[in-house]
Design a protein with these regions (language model features):
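N-terminal export and membrane-targeting signals
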Residues: 1-13
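Primary mode marks residue(s) on the alpha4-beta5-alpha5 output face of response regulator receiver
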Residues: 22-278
């Protein structure tokens, strides 16, 4: 995971390169793959728009549920032998992430506590010819643990719904491998902002750190200034990008953060030139 920071309004001055790269960082939403012990056939799977419990049973989305189906598809071109988890992830996750963005109404889901959850057949199911893949979206609690959700997520990110599931961090996204997600209405140091930057396609070469920074720096500084409503010296634009393995699985984005110089309680959204909250 590549991490950088720049002061909003003084982009390019005193940028410190921060080392460290991982495919998955604890405390940051990432995809989850589930190999169920049950063996449903494709005809028995829940449909797009339905909500499910832990056993893939359909439940009313107005009631507490584990996930919401955003897409159902088939693995193709993999032959009869089980291909292994990495190859399955590389085919399933890009399609599921695209379906998730369309279902939520925005590609900004990487800046939220919503995460893709992918299910596929067990080894026995694969051996009997099952090739289905089920894409669902689940929600993380502010402590980073998955929790049951009440209410549908269809088109949630089209408008004010972003704030309901926004990622906020206890520690610096620019400096910490695990910034520690937390509730946005409590003390925090940084807020993920709308305007996730898509760098390319998973089949393309992974961009270098310098290429990521060249595109992310100006983009994130602009996104943070628009989010805050002013360019300030006490709020920085931070950004985080995924590593090469995650890139091959569809994680081709950069998430921008509005990072303050000290912890605060409240929101930076629309703060303008007012004092940083206590």
């Amino acid at each position: 995971m590549r991490r950088r920071r720049a002061a909003v309004g003084v982009l390019g001055l005193s940028l410190a390169l921060l080392t460290g790269c991982t495919a998955s960082v604890a405390g940051v939403p990432d995809a989850e793959v589930v190999r169920p012990s049950i063996l449903p056939r494709a005809d028995d799977l829940p449909r797009t728009g339905q909500c499910t419990d832990g056993a893939l049973g359909v439940v009313d989305c107005a009631q507490p549920h584990e996930g919401e189906v955003v897409g159902v598809g088939q693995f193709t071109g993999m032959g009869g032998a089980h291909p292994g988890e990495r190859d399955l992830r590389r085919q399933a996750l890009p399609a599921c992430r695209a379906a998730m963005a369309g279902y939520l109404g925005s590609g900004d889901h990487d800046a939220t506590r919503l995460q893709a959850r992918v299910l596929w057949p067990s080894l026995d199911g694969w051996a009997r010819g099952d090739r289905w893949r089920l894409c669902t979206v689940v929600e993380l609690a502010p402590d980073g643990q998955r929790r049951k959700r009440t209410g549908p997520v269809k088109d949630l990110l089209k408008a004010a719904g972003f704030a309901q599931v926004q990622l906020c961090a206890q520690r610096s996204p620019a400096e910490e491998a695990d910034p520690g997600i937390t509730a946005c209405d409590g003390p925090h140091l940084a807020e993920a902002v709308p305007g996730v930057l898509d760098l390319g396609e998973p089949g393309e070469p992974t961009p270098s750190g310098e290429q990521v920074d060249a595109r992310a720096g100006e983009h994130c500084a602009t996104a943070v200034a628009g989010y805050v409503g002013a360019r300030r010296q006490d709020v920085f634009a931070s950004w985080r990008a995924f590593g090469s393995q995650a890139w091959s699985e569809g994680y081709t984005t950069v998430v921008c953060y509005a990072e303050a110089t000290r912890p605060f309680t409240g929101r930076l959204w629309g703060l303008g030139t007012q004092d940083l909250p206590a």
